[in-house]
Amino acid sequence: MVLLDIRNLTLELETSQGLIRAVDRVSLSLREGEIRGLVGESGSGKSLIAKAIVAVLNQRWRIKADRFHWRGEDLLQLPFDQQRRIIGRDIAMIYQEPSKCLDPTATIAEQLQESIPTDGLPGNWWTKGRHKRKKAIALLHKVGIKEHQAVLDSYPYQLSEGVCQKVMIAMAIAKSPKLLIADEPTTALEASTQAQLFRLMGSLNQLKGMSVLLISNELDSIARYTHRLSVLYCGQLVESGDTARVLAQPLHPYTDALIKSVPEFQPDLPPKKPLFALPGSIPTLQHLPVGCRLGPRCPNARKECVHTPVLERKQHHYFSCHFPLQYKESR
C-alpha cells in the first residue's frame, strides 16, 4: 500500500524581490513498511520537503502540488485542522540537533510522558500518570537506553547529543506513527552513535512495520539502510529508484559525482589520488540557473540544458536529464 504519494511538489518563498522557487516539481512516494532515503547537499531542499509533509512551514511559503496524498486522501484539499489531526496521528518527525528541540526547562520524564497519548489508558488522572511513567520507561528501553531513571530525571543539557536523539525517537514513536521522518538525525554524532541510531530505525521498520523517510547529505550512511533512494540537487529531483540499482547504474551526472566522492564506493581508487568533485558550488536561491540547475557545473552540459528536463522512467528507475549516463542503453 502506498502511504505517501506526492506529485510535482513546488515550494515558493515570498521575498521582497518576488517569489523564489526553492523546490521545483519534486515527486516522492513511500510505501508501507519501506525505508526511503532522501539525499543531497545542504541547501538542496530536503528539510523543506519534510517540513511540508508535516505542515510546519510558515506563512511565507507557498505550497503547490498536483497530488499530495496520504493514504489516498489529498491533504492540501482538507481544512487545516483536519490536516493537522491526520498528520499528528500518523506522522512523526525527528530533527537534527535534538538538544535544541527539547524544552530546556522540563525534565525528560515530563516531556516524554506528555508525548504519550492518554487514549486507551485505564483509570483516573492519577492512574493514567502511573501508566504513562511505565510506558515512558518501556520506550527508553526500546530505543536502547538502559539507565532510564537517570535519563528521566535529567534535563536536556545534562545529556549527550546521542542520548537526546534517542529520547527524540522515543517521543516520536510514542504514538506508534505509520511514518517516521528523520531529518539528518546523526549530524554531529560519533560514528558509533550514528550506527546505533540507524540500526534502531531499521529495527523499528522490521519489527513494527513503520515506514521511514531518512534524510541525509551523507550518501554512504543511508545507502546501507534504505530500500529506495531519491537524489536532490538544488530543489530538483535528479534521480530516484531502488537503492542498489541507483548506486550500481547511476543515470544522472550528479548522482554519479556523489558516488565517486565517497571513498567506500571507490575500492579501486589508488592511494593519495584525489576524490572526484564537481567544479563550483551549489547556487544560492537568489541566483538559480535557468533550466537544469546542475547545468553550470555539469561535465555533460549542452545548450539543451537551459530547458528543464522532464522526469523520465527506465523500468523502475527515474531520472531527470537530457543526456543521461549510459545514454544509448537508456534509450
Label every model-predicted segment.
Residues 41, 185, 189-270:
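P-loop NTP-binding/switch modules centered on Walker-like glycine-rich loops
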Residues 169, 180, 193, 197:
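Hydrophobic anchor residue at the start of the ABC signature
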Residues 174-178:
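A short, proline-enriched helix->beta-strand linker immediately N-terminal to the Walker B motif
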Residues 242-331:
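Charged, flexible cofactor/metal-binding loops and thiol motifs
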